[in-house]
Structure formats: C-alpha cells, structure tokens
C-alpha cells in the first residue's frame, strides 16, 4: 500500500512557500510555534464568515506581522473600519506580551481557486443537510468556472446519515500529486452534522510552475 505524504509539505521550497517566516533561539522555538498556532486558531474562529483562506506570520524582533488572505475583506475591516484594531487589541490581551502586532489584508479575487474555501463551502452544505453528492458537484462546478486544471474531493463519515461510515471521492481533470512542479493546493476540514463528523479533503491543481521564485 502506498504511503501518502502531505501535498504542501512535500513541495515546500519548490512551489509552496512557508506560512511562517522567522528565526528563534532553540529555547524559544516551541513557545513561538504555540503562539503562531494560537493566533491562527483565534483568527480563523473570529473571522469564520470572512472567507479566510490562509494566514501568514512573519516576526521581526518584537514585531509580529500577520497577513490574512480573505475573500471578504469588508468583514475583516468592519463597517466602522476598526475591525483590525480590535483584532490587534484582542491578541495583545490574550497573549499577554509586549509584542507589536501588524495585520494586513490581501483580497482574493478568485475564492473558488482556494482549496480551503471550497472545503468550507462543502462543509456548510453538509451541515445544512444537503446530499453530499450535490454539494461535491456544486463545488467542482465552481472550481472549474474559476479556471482550475483539476480538482479532487474526498469525503468520509456517515454520508447522508448512513449507518456505516464510508469514504467517497470525485476527481475532475488532472491532479498530479507526485509531480513536484505541479502547483497543488490542499486543505482538509470537518463538517459537524447531526450524524457525526464528516471529514473533507480537497486537492486543487492550478497548473505547473518551475519554482516559487
């Protein structure tokens, strides 16, 4: 049986960039990793409806720069324009440190090219008790309209309330997972339904590129 490797980790430094950019002393490393993880969890929970696809973190001395890739920047900024200020204040209060936070927003013009947002779309449909095949079909159609070269979606759990859990997958186009130069976007999420948790995995093939540079 073939052993599966994470599609993003497999391509780090080739076609994928790191989501965190910083160096630290060995004694501080684990604390900063935990802090990065907390920041991402907090922002994803706080901005659950803002279509956040990715959060990059960069550290410089005592400053933390956070870049949020979102399909709905208006929900992040807020009507009064103080949404970012409130997020920074909340992070400083919760982390209880003296670091300076800076948050920038990057607008995603084609959200259906992002595997994270496609997965969230399917999860939302499943939580609304929609048939899983219809949810997958709609997600594939949206991705194809956005211009992807290939997409693969896998769902696992008690699908449509079945007594026995199973997994099913659909693939449209090419998804070359063993090609390093293939620009693969991958994500996984969960849909919490009345029948239990359903796992969702999405692979999107956007084309080939030589390197991130």
UniProtKB/Swiss-Prot annotation:
GO CC field: chloroplast; cytosolic small ribosomal subunit
Superkingdom field: Eukaryota
UniProt xrefs under InterPro entries: KH_dom-like_a/b (IPR015946), KH_dom_type_2 (IPR004044), KH_sf_prok-type (IPR009019), Ribosomal_S3_C_sf (IPR036419), Ribosomal_uS3_bac-typ (IPR005704), Ribosomal_uS3_C (IPR001351), Ribosomal_uS3_CS (IPR018280)
UniProt name for this protein: Small ribosomal subunit protein uS3c
SUPFAM superfamilies documented for this protein: Prokaryotic type KH domain (KH-domain type II), Ribosomal protein S3 C-terminal domain
Matches recorded under Gene3D superfamilies: 3.30.300.20, Ribosomal protein S3, C-terminal domain
UniProt-listed GO biological process terms: translation
Domain KH type-2, residue spans: 39-109
CDD domains: KH-II_30S_S3 (cd02412)
Keywords: Chloroplast, Plastid, Ribonucleoprotein, Ribosomal protein, RNA-binding, rRNA-binding
Alphabetized PROSITE patterns for the sequence: KH_TYPE_2, RIBOSOMAL_S3
Subunit annotation: Part of the 30S ribosomal subunit.
Chief place of localization: plastid
PANTHER family for the chain: 30S/40S RIBOSOMAL PROTEIN S3 (PTHR11760), SMALL RIBOSOMAL SUBUNIT PROTEIN US3C (PTHR11760:SF19)
Family assignment from sequence similarity: Belongs to the universal ribosomal protein uS3 family.
NCBIfam families, per the entry: rpsC_bact
Location of the protein in the cell: Plastid, Chloroplast
MF annotations from Gene Ontology: rRNA binding; structural constituent of ribosome
Gene that produces this protein: rps3
């Amino acid at each position: 049986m073939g052993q599966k490797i994470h599609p993003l980790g497999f391509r780090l430094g080739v076609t994928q960039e790191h989501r965190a950019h910083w160096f630290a002393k060995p004694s501080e490393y684990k604390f900063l990793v935990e802090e990065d993880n907390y920041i991402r969890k907090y922002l994803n929970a706080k901005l659950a409806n803002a279509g956040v696809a990715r959060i990059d973190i960069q550290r410089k001395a005592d400053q933390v720069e956070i870049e949020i890739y979102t399909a709905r920047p208006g929900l992040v900024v807020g009507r009064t324009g103080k949404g970012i200020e409130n997020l920074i204040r909340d992070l400083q209060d919760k982390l209880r440190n003296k670091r300076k936070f800076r948050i920038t927003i990057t607008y995603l013009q084609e959200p259906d090219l992002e595997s994270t947002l496609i997965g969230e779309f399917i999860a939302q449909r499943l939580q609304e008790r929609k048939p899983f095949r219809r949810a997958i079909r709609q997600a594939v159609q949206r991705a194809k309209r956005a211009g992807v070269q290939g997409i693969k979606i896998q769902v696992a759990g008690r699908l449509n309330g079945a007594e026995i859990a199973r997994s099913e997958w659909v693939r449209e186009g090419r998804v070359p997972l063993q090609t390093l130069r293939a620009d693969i976007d991958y994500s996984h999420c969960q849909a919490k339904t009345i029948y239990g948790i359903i796992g969702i995995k999405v692979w999107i093939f956007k084309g080939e590129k030589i390197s991130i540079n």
